[in-house]
């Protein structure tokens, strides 16, 4: 029976059982339950498992080295679901101690399967939101990587931090302004739009875009900002007309 076929109480009991069995595995170095949960076909079972690992790491300092060693072992498994769940578990740890799990993301970016790579992007988002300094410093190293997909994924990964704190990621986005790859460019424009519609954010974005050298890209970005205020009109701090008026008044050369 799938996770969400269970009742709310049954789900809570299952999550508790998963946590207990993983804790027992780590204490006894067996890893049977850990391996099974990390490989489970049910996304929510795997999620419960990696969240449990993150909680155990935080609450039981004596098991931290064991957890890192175990994740390293599991990261070499052939099953991509296990490798994906390892990265998600590392992402939970990286919310507080990124340096201890950085190697999992260095490796996961180049995984042969898209699922672990996507887990890296998801982890960058959740870690960057609460632990931005080391995560963004790490991301910056890959902004000019020769693989265009790596550049695109990093650009996408830092977006969530920028939703509330655009000033933190705009200097990194600026480094991509002359990227010649269409997919990277379109992702860059998309991210600029995504970090510009919440309260106080359009002002920060515009103040940065004024200094960008690639005026053609700036124009694309401004059009995206206007359109984002239409698409997200129920959530945006300004209406589409207000956003367009603000841009015309503050960066008219871009439109």
Describe the residue ranges of each PLM region.
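Short inter-helical turns and helix N-cap capping residues of alpha-solenoid HEAT/ARM repeat scaffolds
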Residues: 7, 41-43, 78-79, 112-113, ...
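Extended, charged alpha-helical interaction scaffolds
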Residues: 141-143, 148-159, 170-175, 182-183
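Structural detector for tandem alpha-solenoid helical repeats, activating at a conserved register
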Residues: 44, 81, 100, 115, ...
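Amphipathic alpha-helical scaffolding segments comprising HEAT/armadillo-like alpha-solenoid repeats
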Residues: 25-37, 58-74, 95-108, 130-142, ...
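N-terminal secretory/membrane-targeting helices
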Residues: 40, 156, 165, 254-255
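Short, contiguous, helix-prone interaction/anchoring segments in small proteins
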Residues: 33-53
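Eukaryotic acidic, Ser/Thr-rich intrinsically disordered low-complexity regions
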Residues: 213-255
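Structural detector for internal amphipathic alpha-helices that build alpha-solenoid repeat scaffolds
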Residues: 2-25, 47-61, 83-96, 115-130, ...
